[in-house]
């Protein structure tokens, strides 16, 4: 399963805990058996629990790269946006990165989600199932012919 996690925002929604320097996704707020984990650590752990072989790439800004590497192992892929341009350009750049750098085929499914969802492992299990179904080619391609 190829997953792109979007982590480019400054995360000011948890102000005053988060700000431009300390984004919300890196603040350790979730209690675990060993202490606390951040949003990015939680979502990465959940993905790997569901699919240990999942290829995770985080689309982010250069200011967040060190925080990502400090909180996750270095095997996580990082696609650095040259400048912030919101969601669609981040997805376009990250999918180009998967294709051009990681060698992901044009026919392979890619799951895109935010780095900070508060979901159970069932969510990622469902995404894995959907990714597998899409990979089998049984999905109906989207057609926009009715708009012309």
What are these regions (language model features)?
Residues 1-69, 74-85, 124-125:
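N-terminal glycine-rich phosphate-binding loop and ensuing alpha1 helix
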Residues 106-115:
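Short beta-strand-to-loop acidic/aromatic patch adjacent to the donor-nucleotide binding site
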Residues 73-105:
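Short phosphate-binding loop-to-helix
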Residues 115-129:
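Acidic donor-binding/catalytic loop of UDP-sugar-dependent glycosyltransferases
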Residues 145-148:
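Conserved small/polar residues in nucleotide/adenosyl-binding loops
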Residues 117, 139-143:
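Internal, well-ordered alpha/beta segment that forms a basic, Gly-enriched binding/recognition surface
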Residues 133-137:
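Conserved donor NDP-sugar-binding/catalytic core segment of glycosyltransferases
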Residues 40, 94, 116:
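Residue-level signal for inorganic ion chemistry
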């Amino acid at each position: 399963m190829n997953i792109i996690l979007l982590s480019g925002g400054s995360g000011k929604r948890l102000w005053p805990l988060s700000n431009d320097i300390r984004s919300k996704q890196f603040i350790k707020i979730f209690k675990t058996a060993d202490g606390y984990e951040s949003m990015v650590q939680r979502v990465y752990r959940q993905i790997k629990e569901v699919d240990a072989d999942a290829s995770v790439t985080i689309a982010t800004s250069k200011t967040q790269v060190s925080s990502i590497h400090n909180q996750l192992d270095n095997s996580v892929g990082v696609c650095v946006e040259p400048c912030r341009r919101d969601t669609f350009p981040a997805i376009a750049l990250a999918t180009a990165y998967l294709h051009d750098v990681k060698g992901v085929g044009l026919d392979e499914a890619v799951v895109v989600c935010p780095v900070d969802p508060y979901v159970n492992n069932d969510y990622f299990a469902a995404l894995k199932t959907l990714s597998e179904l899409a990979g089998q080619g049984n999905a109906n391609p989207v057609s926009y012919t009715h708009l012309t």
